[in-house]
Amino acid sequence: IRNAFTMLLCSQGTPMLLAGDEFGNTQLGNNNAYCHDDNITWLNWKHTKSEQDIFEFVKRMIAFRKQHCVLHGKEPLSMFDTKGIGIPDMSVHGTQAWRADFSNYSRMLGILLGGRYGITEDDDIYIAFNMFWEQKVFELPNPTVGKKWYPAIDTHSGEFFTLPPKKKRKRKIKPEKQLFREYLVEPRSIVVFV
């Protein structure tokens, strides 16, 4: 379920959440629950306690989305470098940077969102999707000059990593000292980098 929330909240457009999704509410498969006035449609807010881990994950994902305007831009993504800054607003990758694998059997995808295409200048964001049943190593695209990649979210563990302040992330870094040129992504999980 963390994967679903990560995909939803890292997508462009308005996230469509139904009341209770944030704590795993279910209507037991009933997609016509509008005509029920019983426990199928009632929300049991006690689940916010019993499902605290997913509830907290959703809260933190919403906060992450709010912090990064590149995740909720007003313009549609073009996959072109329309600003002439060296990277497109969005690019698609496979386990190798800049080499997307759209074959039928591929279960891995990387998406790079150019931070300078946000409403205000933002961090670049790279999202590594591994829907395969084994661990996979993802080669990360070169970060913007003077920056390096930091893992921010890992759906396998549900962990949100503490990031250094933006000032420290922008300092000059020698290319050979860049952190995370490759990253091992656990099976059926997503890792978000900034």
Regions found by a protein language model. Give the residues of each.
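Carbohydrate-interacting/catalytic domains
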Residues: R2, T6-L17, D21-V194
